[in-house]
Amino acid sequence: ILIKGRVLDAEYLTPVPYAAVYIHNTPIGVVTDNVGEFSFEAPLSLKHETLVVARQKYEIQYLKLDEQLFSEMIVFMEPDNFAIRSKEFQDSLNAGSNKFASTVSKVADFIKDDWIPLGNPQTNKFDAGRIQTFPTYNPIEGLRLRAGVASNSRLSTNFFMSSYVAYGFGDHRWKYRGELTYSFDKKSYHENKFPKNKLALVYENDLYSPGEMHPRSPNNLLLITFRRSENEATYRNFAEVNYEREYKNGLAHTFWVRRSRLTPQGSLRFDYQLDNMGFNDKELVNSEAGVLVRYSFGEAYEQQKRRRKPIELTSPVFFLSHTVGAYVQFDKSHTYHRSELSAQKRFLLGNTGRLDAVGEVMKVWSRVPFPLLVYPNQRHRHHIENNAFFLNRALEFVADEQYTFRFTFMGDDLLLAKIPIMNQLQIRELISLRASYGRLSDINLPGNAELYDFPDISFEYDSVPYVEGTIGFTNLLGLLRVEYVHRFTYRHHPDALLGKIRVDVTL
């Protein structure tokens, strides 16, 4: 007999990957794949037996086979609330002495949820968010308030809309973004459920720092963002059409076409020299078309309402992309090419902890103005987060060929785990090392005709890489990490930050 079907989360109606499906008291069975599907054959003599479906964090399900054989099974797994009930019981015992901790925990959970249903949670068609980006603060905008809304599958299982509007009380400017998405597969709640197969139209007008953001990264930075971008950032508006597809085998690709306009912020200027005369551009307009290929073996997610959390973090992830673009200057169009290769891997070190490693190579093959060059913090953010350079200024190191390496160690059963209160709060050790090195080819050296003058704070790399390291602890209150960051090289640069305490959010 053929036994096949799907396993879904009963609360979110999302696939449950890597669940054990087997016939009771026999070794016959399989594990669901990364989209919750299973299929296996069993002897006809077992058709009256019981099918068992089990997975961590879910209650075990028992189904009579003879009631399921004539159709494809859909197994709904109820989340196992034992841990939640145990925590509530413990909180009730400690209510008199632990009210503050309980309140902090509830606030942290509220922030992590990130979205609020507009209306009845069982029937609402729109959600408000993101909580994590309202409000934020940065030196350019000062206090920034942002509010957004996104549709879900109750409005349409194929069409999705999302948008936000933000206002900076320091720069007194409105920012906004709108996105219309068509998913070629019907989705249970949001358009990003694995595997994606969607076409999107995007328009955005917001702050953009070339030295702190990858050109294709969403503007979702938290808390004290653009920390060293004052007078080194731009305002950017762009329109884009992109198509993204993910496959069950871990392969994914994105194609995009975009037209952007960059306007310098603060004292940043787009000045250049031509025939011994000085000129200034008020804006830089460019168009791009590109492709990104990603591969992650065994890619699978725990898919919740509006989030998807990767299950397998130890498989390496590879990125390869190429962009063809053109920028306009003196009413002439100049073509450029940009290539990127990135790899990231998590290593488990037994009870000691884990080590996250990320390596990147970027190359601009053509003559381009400095906003289109590469910088240390331009990176693909996937499973491994919170590894950004911290002490360098946004545009401090300019290059058209760049290599970066980032290593982060987080302890498990080390010193802090031996201290009862630290272990109870799950606070763990954190050590990291980051290095960046690059070169600037002759065609992009300062002083070349029709290239913008570099900002005064921009430098080429010398014979050594830029290196910084950190030591601290993470998982404070379940979402904060605190560390001391130290700068090892290029300490002679003007206004260089040599060391600083950093507080960051891990969500």
Residue spans of the language-model regions?
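Short Pro-Gly-centered beta-turn/loop motif in secreted/extracellular proteins
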Residues: 13-17, 39-48, 65-67
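A generic beta-sheet turn/junction motif
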Residues: 14, 23-25, 44-46, 350, ...
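Short, acidic Ser/Thr/Gly-rich low-complexity loop/linker segments typical of extracellular
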Residues: 27-37
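Exposed, low-structure sequence patches enriched in small/polar residues
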Residues: 85-507
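Conserved "repeat-terminator" motif of extracellular CCP/Sushi domains
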Residues: 74-83, 283
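Exposed aromatic-hydrophobic patches
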Residues: 37-43, 74, 149
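A short, solvent-exposed loop/turn motif at the edges and junctions
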Residues: 23-25, 47-64, 68-69, 79-82
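Structural motif
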Residues: 2-17
